[in-house]
Regions:
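Sec-exported extracytoplasmic/periplasmic mature domains
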Residues: 94-106, 131, 172, 200-207
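N-terminal export/membrane-targeting signals
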Residues: 1-22
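Short secondary-structure boundary motifs at beta->alpha junctions and helix caps
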Residues: 76-83, 144-147, 156-205
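A structural "domain/chain start" motif
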Residues: 21-95, 114, 201-207
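Short connector loops/turns at beta-strand edges and beta->alpha or beta->beta junctions
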Residues: 65-70, 129-131, 170-174
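Surface-exposed short loop/turn segments
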Residues: 23-36, 103-104, 109-162, 174-182
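Short alpha-helical segments and helix-capping/turn motifs at coil-helix boundaries
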Residues: 7, 44-46, 108
């Protein structure tokens, strides 16, 4: 690692580590209400009705609505990359959710809307995605040029159709350990993986 990048990394960690540790120690309430900085890693959650994840044996992930995410001008060189990232969003989300989830529930991706009992539906809207800057990631060191994604995710009881909770979350990925800072597509994928892991943590909290 370059000396300048190492110095930046040390300074950033010294600043954010205590705050991150403190945030991770906060209890995660499951009573109805709207909470910011909930649990260890959630920006905002609105709990409409509490539930127990062990009461469900199946989780259906529906395709994310990507039509709300702003697109760059078609002349921009990363227009195609953004379109590809949005098209792959649900697939990437599944890749991140399944391995992280501790609950004993089968996870499937489907566009249908089941009315089955003991089934949760995960659906959401991609609010924004940004590839960041590969040059920034390569030359700027830790955190610079990071890609990002933001989504609003609903957790729904399939049988009743009622929304149980709404999570608003943004994630960044800096491609720190990728050669050349990682391609734009790679780091956007990483940000979606991180988002999906966050949703797994939310589900596992409701016990």
């Amino acid at each position: 690692m370059r000396p300048r990048s190492l110095l930046v990394l040390i300074v950033v960690l010294a600043v954010i580590a205590p705050a991150a540790y403190a945030r991770g120690k906060k209890p995660a309430p499951t009573a109805p209400g709207t909470y910011k900085e909930w649990g260890q890693d959630i920006d905002q959650i609105e709990i409409i009705k509490t539930f127990r994840i062990q009461d469900y044996d199946k989780i259906i992930v529906q395709p994310f609505d990507t039509t709300k995410a702003p697109l760059p001008d078609k002349k921009e060189k990363w227009y195609g990359t953004m379109k590809s990232a949005l098209a792959a969003y649900t697939e990437w989300f599944m890749e991140g959710l399944q391995p992280e989830l501790k609950a004993k529930a089968d996870v499937e991706q489907s566009s249908s809307v089941p009315k089955a009992s003991k089934t949760l539906i995960i659906r959401g809207v991609v609010d924004s995605m940004d590839p960041g800057s590969r040059a920034g990631r390569y030359w700027g060191g830790f955190g610079a040029g990071a890609a990002s994604s933001k989504a609003t995710v609903e957790i729904v009881d399939a049988k009743s159709g009622k929304v149980l909770a709404i999570v608003t979350q943004a994630r960044r990925a800096a491609g720190t350990f990728k050669g050349g800072g990682g391609s734009d597509l790679e780091v956007m994928r990483d940000s979606v993986h991180a988002m999906a892991k966050d949703i797994a943590h939310v589900l596992d909290t409701f016990v």
